[in-house]
Amino acid sequence: SGITNSFPKWTIQGGTGRAVAMLQDPSQRGVIIEQLEQGKDVACLTLGDPTIYSTYIYIHRIVKAHGYATEIINGIPSFCAVSAKLQDSLVDRSEQLHIIPSTYDIEAALELPGTKVLMKAASKMPLVKATLKEKHMTGTMIENCGMPEEHIYHKIDEIPERASYYSIIVVKEGNHD
């Protein structure tokens, strides 16, 4: 019968820690739990896939811990959307694929074989760019993939020092012709 209520928007600026803290606060958690107690269905929409670096999974776990039935419906992972936008595969044949958050040791990550997908790269952009240059590696960054503000950077030098939270860098080994 349509959307009757909306929940507070948990902004990216607050981060996952803020969202988890809000859900642990009974007055905030109540927004969701009250709806369920009234027999209403609740849906949470997220960008990308709800199981990959998504704040949603914390909501899911709390709702499930309160004894309510939960269901996760997969989405299109952002790195797959990026690959499609670039019109290329992420990996071919027996190549390895590594999905790496920016909180990981970037230098160690770039030593891994195969394709590296650097998620949430904006938080360490100067370090990421410097490390890629130092290692003579190339990569492509898509900022805000699928959104009106989408921008593709094909060269490391083109990538701005400050980029959107929704920035993904793909670093590939070898040719994919």
What residues fall within each predicted segment?
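A contiguous loop/helix-start segment that scaffolds small-molecule binding in enzyme catalytic cores
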Residues: 42, 110-177
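Generic secondary-structure signature for well-ordered alpha-helical cores
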Residues: 30-37, 69, 88-91, 133-138, ...
